[in-house]
Amino acid sequence: MVIVALSASAQKTISYEGADETVRLWDNKTAKHTNYETRDEAWKKKNSIWQTSSCELYIFKAAEGKNTGIAVAIFPGGSYTNLNLQISLAQWYASQGITAAIVKYRLPNRGHYEATLEDAMGAVRYLRTRSDLGIDPAKVGVTGSSAGGHLSTWVSNAMPVGEKPAFVIPLYGWINLYESKSLAAEKALVQLLGPGYNSQKAINLSTHLMVDENTSPTLLFLCYDDSLVPSTDGVEYYEALVRHGVKASMHIFPFGGHSVKKHTAEYQTLIIEWLKYLGLISEK
């Protein structure tokens, strides 16, 4: 593992030993925005990080001899409360010749979401600089699950035209914040927007309302029986994409709950076919 530190942190932070590289972009003292987290970062269960105060990328290099030039930033889910690292997903992308970077982003910490968005956009921009990894800057996309799915769609709308990701792949992503009804969603909203948030804030960060003709091409995966994030969230996002003429594809599995693990082989095949459709992987 190679560790590249672009800034120093006064707090104890987490690096992941399984990655080919760990790159720190910044922390609360060196970034433009802060999430005001003062506690040390901590593992509380396997592959789950809490109390983040710095942005790091855990990079898994594309398999030798298979490099497609594509890179993907993976935004972990965890209700904006913690980050559940998807190691197997990163390893699968790497095996397909796609450089994968799990983004340890700064959690919003009860309303400081500017830091979260800064980290997500910074990850995309950083990957575009890594020509030494064989990355084509025009082939950098994003993916994420649940809250990470929300962040991936947010990035695809918030980044300036000309900088947007080449593709977006939300996995059971949280989209419609202002109509979220579950207790889990309410807790996530407090983490994202802060205690005592008003409904307008939830509307402003509902990403289906951000979509325009410049939104990145998007491939959505949902499960019909998801009780945490209703599949209608993804449907609303898909409909917004279609209305604005954005390339889009949506797959709703009949079962699986708040996960697509039961459909791994299917969704992985569909991802590769989507990337071929976009012209990012050449047909053989």
What are these regions (language model features)?
Residues 43-44, 173-210, 216:
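Mobile cap/lid helix-loop segments that gate and shape the active-site cleft of serine hydrolases
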Residues 214, 220-222, 226:
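Short beta-strand/loop motif that positions the catalytic acidic residue
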Residues 122-184, 202:
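Primarily recognizes the serine-hydrolase "nucleophile elbow" in alpha/beta-hydrolase
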